[in-house]
Amino acid sequence: MNVRQRASIYQTIERLLRDGQISVKETLRETGKPDRTVYEITNEGREILIEWIREVLSTPIQEFPNFPVAISYISLLSPHDALEKLEQRIDVLEKTVQQIDNNLQTYKSLIPRLFMLESEYQKTVLAAELEWVRSASEDIRNGSLFWNDEWLSDIAERLTSKEE
């Protein structure tokens, strides 16, 4: 479930209520503050959640993040521009991996590993992405990965002439 905006959180709650997957546990009232509703998962909701977890854990699916799409169109940028953007991504990835690692180190003696698996996974995935982006950036920097309009036109011409 992708919940990115406040409105979609309320829509998600309404749908879960409508479908009987959650129910209202209580409504808390404080003077001068809006009512706060506390929800709890229903037995049906728990069964659906457990089945979803089993499915997602056991079956790799093709997800569609934006980064691979941008990579497929990187030739629309100049190598210089692409390198600049990839270096910005490296900075963000380095900081994020370091932050996750710091959190893992800080809490490993306090929190059982079971509850840190998500962070471990995120760190591993981001570290792999960081390694790839560094490699591609270095290849652009040293000229072993290069393109320009003339080269792209030549490639397009060769590929289309082979199709005919």
Regions found by a protein language model. Name each.
Residues 12, 86-89, 122, 129:
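Amphipathic alpha-helix face/heptad-repeat signature
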Residues 79, 86, 112-115, 119, ...:
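Amphipathic alpha-helical coiled-coil segments and their boundaries
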Residues 86, 93-104, 126, 133:
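Non-transmembrane amphipathic alpha-helical segments
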